[in-house]
Amino acid sequence: MFIPKKTKYKKDFKGRISGNAKGGYTLSFGSYGLKALEPCRLTSKQIESARRSISRTLKRVGKVWIRAFCHTSVSKKPMDVRMGKGKGSVEMWVCKVKPGKILFEISGVSLNLAREALNKAQAKLPMKCKFVSDEL
């Protein structure tokens, strides 16, 4: 899935997602895209689920780019474990998404098919998104 091969540190701080995206807010590769409208932590499973729904809708036509990658680890302690005794083990990997970030891009398909595919992908994501196009 979408996890890094190697990291400098195994566990990250939780942190906050503040402000708007400083980069990655314009279409770079495709003609159509899905833009985040609110801050969120996207898991690698959610990104993979959205990617699958896009590829099923497009049916091997066009090209898809995924512009979000999971760099941050999230740790969790097991059930019925008391507080303390160190930080828990890594549970999942997440991508911290700021408002304005382009998540997916599509090219080589019609406007209607791209809108349908990205709307299905949007339903898999836990935040509000907007369909963007370089034509509009």
From Swiss-Prot:
Query: What are the entry keywords?
Result: Ribonucleoprotein, Ribosomal protein, RNA-binding, rRNA-binding, tRNA-binding
Taxonomy of the source species: Bacteria, Pseudomonadati, Pseudomonadota, Alphaproteobacteria, Rickettsiales
Name of the coding gene: rplP
> What family does the Swiss-Prot or TrEMBL record give for this protein?
Belongs to the universal ribosomal protein uL16 family.
**Cellular component aspect of the GO annotation:** cytosolic large ribosomal subunit
UniProt cross-references to PANTHER family, sorted A to Z? 50S/60S RIBOSOMAL PROTEIN L16, LARGE RIBOSOMAL SUBUNIT PROTEIN UL16M
Write one Gene Ontology MF term: rRNA binding
InterPro entries (UniProt xref) = Ribosomal_uL16 (IPR047873), Ribosomal_uL16_bact-type (IPR000114), Ribosomal_uL16_CS (IPR020798), Ribosomal_uL16_dom (IPR016180), Ribosomal_uL16_sf (IPR036920)
Name of this protein: Large ribosomal subunit protein uL16
Q: What does this protein do?
A: Binds 23S rRNA and is also seen to make contacts with the A and possibly P site tRNAs.
Name the domain of life this protein comes from: Bacteria
Q: Name one GO biological process term.
A: translation
User: Which organism encodes this protein?
Assistant: Ehrlichia canis (strain Jake)
Family matches, as SUPFAM superfamilies: Ribosomal protein L16p/L10e
Quaternary context: Part of the 50S ribosomal subunit.
